[in-house]
Amino acid sequence: MEKIPSFQLDHIRLKRGIYVSRKDYIGGEVVTTFDIRMKEPNREPVLGAPELHTIEHLAATYLRNHPLYKDRIVFWGPMGCLTGNYFLMRGDYVSKDILPLMQETFRFIRDFEGEVPGTEPRDCGNCLLHNLPMAKYEAEKYLREVLDVATEENLNYPD
C-alpha cells in the first residue's frame, strides 16, 4: 500500500503552527483541511486526552457559532497522535487566512469559565474525559509561543 500524504510529511522537522494539510474538491467547492499543530511531534510531550477533548468541545462550539465563519465550518477534531487538531473549512484558504480566527478561538478557550458545552452524559460519548484547567493552560501556551508570534515556518510545512 502507498503511504498516505500525511505520513509522508517530515514530522522530525515539523514545528508547532497552522498548516494546510490538504484541499479537497467536493461538489465544485474546495474544502481546506488545516493541521492545527500544538506540539512538536516526537520532541515534546503530547497533549493529554482530557485537555484535548475539552479543547475540541470549546473550539467546535466557538467556531460553529462564529458570526462570520459558522457557515464555513465543516469539522474540528483531535489528531490520533495527540499533537493537535484537524480543522476543515469550506473554501480555498491558506494558513495566514485563518491565523486571526485561530487566535480568537484559542483566546476563547484560554478565557473560558463555566461548564464546558456538551459535557453531560446525553451529549458526549466520554463525558468524564475533560480537563478545563489544562485546556486553558495549553491554549495560553499555544497562543503565546506560536499563534501570537507566528512566522512562515509556523504557517508552511517544511520542504
Curated annotation (Swiss-Prot):
Q: Which gene encodes it?
A: luxS
Annotated function: Involved in the synthesis of autoinducer 2 (AI-2) which is secreted by bacteria and is used to communicate both the cell density and the metabolic potential of the environment. The regulation of gene expression in response to changes in cell density is called quorum sensing. Catalyzes the transformation of S-ribosylhomocysteine (RHC) to homocysteine (HC) and 4,5-dihydroxy-2,3-pentadione (DPD).
One of the Pfam families matching this protein, by short name:
LuxS
Q: Which InterPro entries match?
A: LuxS_sf, Metalloenz_LuxS/M16, S-ribosylhomocysteinase
Question: What is the enzyme's class at the highest EC level?
Answer: lyase
Q: Which family does it belong to?
A: Belongs to the LuxS family.
Protein's UniProt name: S-ribosylhomocysteine lyase
Annotated positions binding Fe cation: 53, 57, 124
Assembly and partners? Homodimer.
| Provenance organism | Porphyromonas gingivalis (strain ATCC BAA-308 / W83)
- Cofactor remark from the record: Binds 1 Fe cation per subunit.
What keywords is this UniProt entry annotated with? Autoinducer synthesis, Iron, Lyase, Metal-binding, Quorum sensing
Q: Recorded GO terms, molecular function?
A: iron ion binding; S-ribosylhomocysteine lyase activity
Which HAMAP family does the entry link to? LuxS
Catalytic activity annotated for this protein?
Answer: S-(5-deoxy-D-ribos-5-yl)-L-homocysteine = (S)-4,5-dihydroxypentane-2,3-dione + L-homocysteine
Gene Ontology process terms (BP): quorum sensing
Q: What is its EC number?
A: 4.4.1.21
